[in-house]
């Protein structure tokens, strides 16, 4: 029997504005912030009000559609110049999230043949909506494929938030929990809190509880003990960038879990859409890793917890080598084994 599941959304298009779920306010309050300029979109991405690679791509696409509406009186050449400037500007917001650049490129390519600004504005709005709609379908498909990896009653560990609020809907790593709930397959999530800004503790627990899905929160340094004592059956994570050989950039701490999975001999899955793949890069060594402000580590909710002046290293992501990954779950199926060959083959089939 199917069950209706409450699945929150993070981005909505209002025609002349974008409404984003302000994820920095969760779980204490559910606030939607209205964005009306390209600068507000950029800041919202940088400040993690909207986050998750697919959601970042979606809000960037809407941001470009929104910005185009302010250029109605320009000549077409000047419009193109300002639009390209906006594309480059948004690209500086989160350099590791490949979906951001994928969405920007799609928006840029969609108006290559336009002859009027009115035509461009219409096409850009339609393309942004299409990106959002496609992502929802893609995430559901990822969830369907991922669910085949698990059985009723499984305990599954995850990190950060690769859920509905990080995408158009359903999420990637959390998609099988939603699809499982719909189909009566009970999956229990163990969520790492995910320092330094606690996306697991604040966001994953919040959205799964909204849907009535069992979730247990653990500190990041409890992961090994939890696997050892709580009968964790598998680990599933999202991705911010996957390169041609399968090396995967995701939230800092992901590689720790992959190493633990190898040691304890449990499956380690990556769930991501094809738009998260960057096959222009051959190995993870080529991925640019964003480093964030030291205050994310030295302060917790505004309170200083380390001596002032302490040196901080705060990378937002790490890169998990392909040899630690059991399978990469995409909307087209599950890739495993020879990742380089399988990824090339997958993109040849979809091109």
Curated annotation (Swiss-Prot):
InterPro entries: IF-2B-related, IF-M1Pi, IF_2B-like_C, Initiation_fac_2B_a/b/d, M1Pi_N, NagB/RpiA_transferase-like
Stated name of the protein: Methylthioribose-1-phosphate isomerase
Active site annotation, chain numbering: 240 (proton donor)
Enzyme kind, highest EC tier: isomerase
Subunit note: Homodimer.
GO biological process, one term: L-methionine salvage from methylthioadenosine
Keywords: Amino-acid biosynthesis, Isomerase, Methionine biosynthesis
E.C. numbers: 5.3.1.23
């Amino acid at each position: 029997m199917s069950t209706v599941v409450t699945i929150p959304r993070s981005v909505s298009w209002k025609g002349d504005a974008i409404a984003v779920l302000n994820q920095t306010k969760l779980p204490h309050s559910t606030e939607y912030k209205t964005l009306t300029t390209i600068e507000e979109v950029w800041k919202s991405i940088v400040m993690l009000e909207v986050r998750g690679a697919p959601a970042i791509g979606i809000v960037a696409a809407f941001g470009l559609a929104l910005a185009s509406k302010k250029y109605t009186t320009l000549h077409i050449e000047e419009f193109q110049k300002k639009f390209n400037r906006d594309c480059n500007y948004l690209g500086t917001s989160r350099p590791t999230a490949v979906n951001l650049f994928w969405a920007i490129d799609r928006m840029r390519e969609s108006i290559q043949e336009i002859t009027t600004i009115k035509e461009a504005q219409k096409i850009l709005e339609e393309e942004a909506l299409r990106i959002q709609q496609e992502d929802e379908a893609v995430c559901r498909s990822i969830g369907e494929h991922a669910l085949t990896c698990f059985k009723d009653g499984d305990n599954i560990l995850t990190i950060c938030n690769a859920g509905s609020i990080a995408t158009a809907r359903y999420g990637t790593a959390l998609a099988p929990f939603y699809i499982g709930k719909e189909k009566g397959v009970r999956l229990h999530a163990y969520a790492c809190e995910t320092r330094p800004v606690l996306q697991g503790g604040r966001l994953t627990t919040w959205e799964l509880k909204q849907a009535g899905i069992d979730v247990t929160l653990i500190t990041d340094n409890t992961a090994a003990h939890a696997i050892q004592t709580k009968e964790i059956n598998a680990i599933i994570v999202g991705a911010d960038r996957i390169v041609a050989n399968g090396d995967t950039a995701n939230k800092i701490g992901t590689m720790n879990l992959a190493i633990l999975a190898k040691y304890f001999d449990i499956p380690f899955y990556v769930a991501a859409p094809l738009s998260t793949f960057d096959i222009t890069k051959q190995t993870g060594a080529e991925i640019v890793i964003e480093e964030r402000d030291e205050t994310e580590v030295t302060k917790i909710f505004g309170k200083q917890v380390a001596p002032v002046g302490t040196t901080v290293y705060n990378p937002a992501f790490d890169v998990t080598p392909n040899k630690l990954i059991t399978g990469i779950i995409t909307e087209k199926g599950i890739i495993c084994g020879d990742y380089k060959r399988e990824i090339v083959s997958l993109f040849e089939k979809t091109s």
